[in-house]
């Protein structure tokens, strides 16, 4: 029995030893008889360890090709010696070619214009030859001649010079004759022409296909099933796009709870209903309602129709009513006509008018009945991150405008500018930093409280009551550190810093807190808690703001 056990132990020892030997890496070494050639080989960055012989021999071929690209066209592998797990490749590099003398024909002259030609011949440093041939192929592809062939023929090597004839067999120029949508046949056709910038004469090339693939990810009301595909026939080119209509309507509800000075609970709430692409035209409609007890109330309607009359013009109209206690009521009309520059940016002209009614019949709080109007410009650029949360990687919007305000019979000129910018910086797969800045400035010879911009709350400076801060000039920074807990959720910190100009003077504000955002099948829920302080008032934990933001998709 003891003898049998000993045999088993010996057998297992041998088995593991053999497996260990079989699992050992194969080591590749490069050598040459010539010292100067050995120095060249030592500078090559190559894969030294391999599991399979086939991988090792493939690496030797790659090294030989690399040597040809840097001028050693006649390099040879004399032999590969094996000693255990070490494989030694013996190279002979031979003479190095420094220059290529390329003869051109009539078809190839325009593609090598960066080099001066003489007698239909150009001299190209050997180290630039491969890149030059690659550029020629890329330029032909941009012209729609994707099936062209670029070749060096009649290659001869004499001393340190390579002689060859450049032959370019240009293929027929191809255009995208037809775009076919699969999976969402009712996809708005206006997007094909104006969003993707495609027409019957659009040149087919790889760059355009990549642009379309990237732009597709930025459309909020579709899911991309798979990348674009192309079908080539003898005379036509068909582009296939694979989309699926997704649930993009959203109902957004926010409930906020805080404590008033008398100790009672203050309830803040709003409804934000957005209908996107309801008619398969890419249109947007929004209904926003907000009420904070009896203190203030707002109703806003917005409508946007993209690419009207199959053009690059997209009008947007909004109407809102805001009531502050029983002090004043503001009615605002905004209109924008945007011109699409490309899928990421647009330029627009705007007109907005506002009228305000003083409900107190006195001017104790610097409130007057007035009306104003502004004409302005707008530039907007956004680059989607294409993540699960529909975040933007980079966003910027600038809106300068000029106008007039009328109080009784007195008119005064005004100027205002509003700018918003944000950036999402990925540190690694799980960690990211989000930065957002919004700046507003109103210039006037006098200011009324009921014409000032209103900020504060979950969508601006967290830790303060919704729209509780009236300001003629402000700039605030939202800073978040985000930690991805899963593909569909993340924790984040809140650090909001602001400098504001109010009727009471200039103040610095700070809001800090924590939040957690997660998604379910048809909803996105954002929970946060924030605490604010100002220059004149410190932190008060009894004034902590709890925010619950629930977005339902349907």
Feature roles, as predicted:
Residues 72, 322-328, 403-413, 536-539:
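Outer-membrane beta-barrel proteins
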Residues 258-261, 376-486, 493-497:
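C-terminal outer-membrane beta-barrel translocator/porin domains of Gram-negative envelope proteins
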Residues 24-34, 44-259, 270-272, 286-293, ...:
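Periplasmic polypeptide-binding modules associated with outer-membrane biogenesis and secretion
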Residues 485, 490-513:
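C-terminal hydrophobic structural anchor segments
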Residues 205-208, 212-227, 231-397, 425, ...:
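Gram-negative/organellar outer-membrane beta-barrel architecture
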Residues 1-29, 554:
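Bacterial Sec-dependent N-terminal signal peptides
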Residues 478-480, 509-517:
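Short glycine-rich, acidic/polar surface loops and turns
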Residues 355-357, 404, 441-443, 499-501, ...:
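Feature marks short, surface-exposed loop/turn motifs that line or immediately flank catalytic pockets
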């Amino acid at each position: 029995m003891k003898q049998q056990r000993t045999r088993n132990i010996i057998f297992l020892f041998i088995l593991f030893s053999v497996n260990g030997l079989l699992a050992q890496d194969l080591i590749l070494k490069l050598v040459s008889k010539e010292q100067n050639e050995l120095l060249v080989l030592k500078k090559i960055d190559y894969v030294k360890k391999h599991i399979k012989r086939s991988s090792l021999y493939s690496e030797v071929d790659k090294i030989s090709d690399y040597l040809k690209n840097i001028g050693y066209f006649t390099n040879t592998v004399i032999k590969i010696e094996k000693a255990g797990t070490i494989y030694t490749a013996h190279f002979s590099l031979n003479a190095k070619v420094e220059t290529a003398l390329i003869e051109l024909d009539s078809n190839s002259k325009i593609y090598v214009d960066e080099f001066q030609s003489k007698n239909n011949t150009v001299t190209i440093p050997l180290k630039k030859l491969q890149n030059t041939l690659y550029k020629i192929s890329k330029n032909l592809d941009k012209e729609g001649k994707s099936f062209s062939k670029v070749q060096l023929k009649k290659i001869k090597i004499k001393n340190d010079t390579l002689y060859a004839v450049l032959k370019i067999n240009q293929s027929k120029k191809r255009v995208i004759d037809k775009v076919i949508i699969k999976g969402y046949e009712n996809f708005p056709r206006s997007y094909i022409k104006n969003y993707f910038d495609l027409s019957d004469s659009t040149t087919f090339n790889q760059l355009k296909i990549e642009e379309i693939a990237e732009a597709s990810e930025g459309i909020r009301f579709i899911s991309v099933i798979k990348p674009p595909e192309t079908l080539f026939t003898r005379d036509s080119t068909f582009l296939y796009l694979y989309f699926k209509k997704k649930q993009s309507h959203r109902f957004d509800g926010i409930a906020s709870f805080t404590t008033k000075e008398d100790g009672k609970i203050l309830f803040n709430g709003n409804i934000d209903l957005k209908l996107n692409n309801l008619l398969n035209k890419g249109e947007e409609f929004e209904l926003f309602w907000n009420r904070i007890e009896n203190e203030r109330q707002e109703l806003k309607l917005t409508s946007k129709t993209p690419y009207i009359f199959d053009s690059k013009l997209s009008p947007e109209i909004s109407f809102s009513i805001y009531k502050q206690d029983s002090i004043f009521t503001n009615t605002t009309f905004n209109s924008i006509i945007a011109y699409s520059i490309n899928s990421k940016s647009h330029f627009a002209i705007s007109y907005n008018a506002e009228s305000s009614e003083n409900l107190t019949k006195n001017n104790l709080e610097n409130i007057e009945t007035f009306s104003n109007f502004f004409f302005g410009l707008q530039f907007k650029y956004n680059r989607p991150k294409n993540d699960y949360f529909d975040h933007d990687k980079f966003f910027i919007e600038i809106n300068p405008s000029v106008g007039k305000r009328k109080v009784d019979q007195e008119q005064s000129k005004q100027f205002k500018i509003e700018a918003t910018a944000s950036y999402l910086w990925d540190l690694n797969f799980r960690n990211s930093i989000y930065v957002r800045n919004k700046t507003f400035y109103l210039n006037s010879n006098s200011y009324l409280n009921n014409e000032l911009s209103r900020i504060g709350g979950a969508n601006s400076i967290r830790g303060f009551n919704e729209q509780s801060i009236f300001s003629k000039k402000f700039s605030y920074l939202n800073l978040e550190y985000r930690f991805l807990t899963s593909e569909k959720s993340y924790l984040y910190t809140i650090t909001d810093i602001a400098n504001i100009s109010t009727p009471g003077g200039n103040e610095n504000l700070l809001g800090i807190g924590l939040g957690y955002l997660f998604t379910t099948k048809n909803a996105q829920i954002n929970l946060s808690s924030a605490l604010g302080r100002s220059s004149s008032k410190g932190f008060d934990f009894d004034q902590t703001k709890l925010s619950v933001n629930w977005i339902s998709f349907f």
